[in-house]
Amino acid sequence: MSVLEKNITRGGEFIIKETDCNNVFTPEDFNEEQLMMKQAVHDFIEKEVLPHRERFENKDYKLTEEIMKKAGDLGFLSVAVPTEYGGMGMGFVSTMLVCETISGACGSLSTAFGAHTGIGTMPIVLYGNKEQNEKYVPKLASGEMFGSYCLTEPTAGSDANSGKTKAVLSEDGKHYKITGQKMWISNAGFAKLFIVFARIEDDKNITGFIVPNEADNGITLGEEEKKLGIHSSSTRQVFFNETKVPVENMLSERGNGFKIAMNSLNVGRIKLAVACLDAMKRVNSHAIQYANERTQFKTKIIDFEAIKEKLAQMATETYVGESATYRAAKDIEDRIKIRHESGNSFQEAELKGVEEFVIECSILKVAVSEDMQNIADEGIQIFGGMGFSAETPMEGAWRDSRIGRIYEGTNEINRMLSVGMLIKKAMKGHLDIITPATNVGKELMEIPSFEVPDLTELFSQEKLIIKNLKKVFLMLAGAGIQKYGDKLEEHQQMLLNVSDVLIEVYMAESALLRTEKNVKRFGEEKQKNQIRMTKLYLYQAVDIIQSKAKQVIISSSEGDEQRGLLMGLKRFTKYYEFPNTIELKNKIAETLKSENKYCF
């Protein structure tokens, strides 16, 4: 076992193991090459995107296509593509960093970029054969052609495998004829290549096809959809009427389409999270700057505690989201590297590396998309009446952020998926949660210790709380499995509450690990606000976990069992020294005021 493999946590393992802060990646660990790439993308956005904000809001689809072509000329579309197919072949973390930086200024461009570089290109990169990759991927990487992903249908949304689009083999066996209707297809208006999912005969699972958008081949487009947000992202229905597709354009193998679709979503989920981060930072900065300028009652509104509270909360959610997203991104990159070194092909290593962290990807998608919307909403509130005006950046940010909770599987689906996949891993023997869950059960039967632990060392209380919050999850999961067995997935409200416990543990621990690592590296004084944000978020996470766990316990138990579980919850969410959250928020806000921007 390599040193790397020994030190990194496996997917989902965070809930049963303690992680050393030295073994996590933080944004402060970006290397020189990554920072140069980030700056290049930032400069591109400042020059090519920000001056045209009004055009993007006015449904200028041509502008989006033009900007995408320019991004292709600069190589930004090819970061994740192997060098043999015209790409940069950069790692997973670098791919996420480019995605973050290019996505924050404009939701329309974020959608177009994500749809093309992700689900419009990577299914061929990861599932296509050599000939398919050589034929299509260099053109996708350069921006010579743009890709689009045709999965959703009028009757097949979350239930993606229920699509009715048909693929019928021609009599001469040389083509499939695809007939059906796809909807909500991003980039459809300018895509020259479609990844299309259709069912062959009465197959249980759908099949993927690479379908060039050629004239006179039975492909027609609906009108541009009228959407709440992302106004200049092309979104249309795509109709196929006996569209001829050469048999050699089948992607992977027959019946493998559902697997392709699900694995594409895994990558899409963490990419959606990272795409929100720069937008969150920008909204933070806009709100801070406005609050520093706006005067009411002869006082700058940033000096009112009601505004300080909002700004501190917005900054905290941004810091935590960034901490968790890049933690997971590096874990995925490391797992891909380990698989490469053990002899896996590029495709196998990439697919298995991401698939292992499907739980974390779902967690991030939910947490960061909801924080993004909350931050945009509070940004409007800080702007007051001006925030409701399309003349300010807040109105567009709020509308664009709403789609995040729907993309890549709704947040409800992802919540249930995170817990379901964790339990499935346990049942398959890939993750031992049975032993720690059993140990938690034994601990509940013992008389609790009333000894106050030594809390003099920085984060000693926070580490203890994180450790105990993991026990809360194990307690709830164990009780749920014991009562409902394999029918647990039918109890969706219970799963949604349990998943919120899982989410808060991962997010809070990620912030703690980042801050602890950077305190060791830069010193406590330079990390004082990060320490405050970490403590603030954890305290709020405990509040959420107490509420969610109580609902689960009350709904799934009664009598002595219920009383025992509630006592266990009280024990595992105990604070010895309560943080002064009002003071923490005021001090965080004072730094934001002096820096006049998001600065963490």
How would you describe each model-predicted region?
Residues 2-23, 97-98, 119, 375, ...:
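Glycine-rich phosphate/cofactor-binding loops in nucleotide/flavin-utilizing enzymes
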Residues 104-107, 156-157, 183-189, 267, ...:
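Glycine-rich phosphate/pyrophosphate-binding beta-alpha loops
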Residues 1-114, 131-135, 139-146, 158, ...:
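Amphipathic, small/basic residue-rich leader segments at the start of a protein or domain
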Residues 444-600:
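C-terminal amphipathic alpha-helical interaction region
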Residues 53-58, 319-367, 380-381, 485, ...:
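C-terminal helix-coil-helix/basic helical segment that borders enzyme active sites and/or dimer interfaces
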Residues 174-220:
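A short core secondary-structure module
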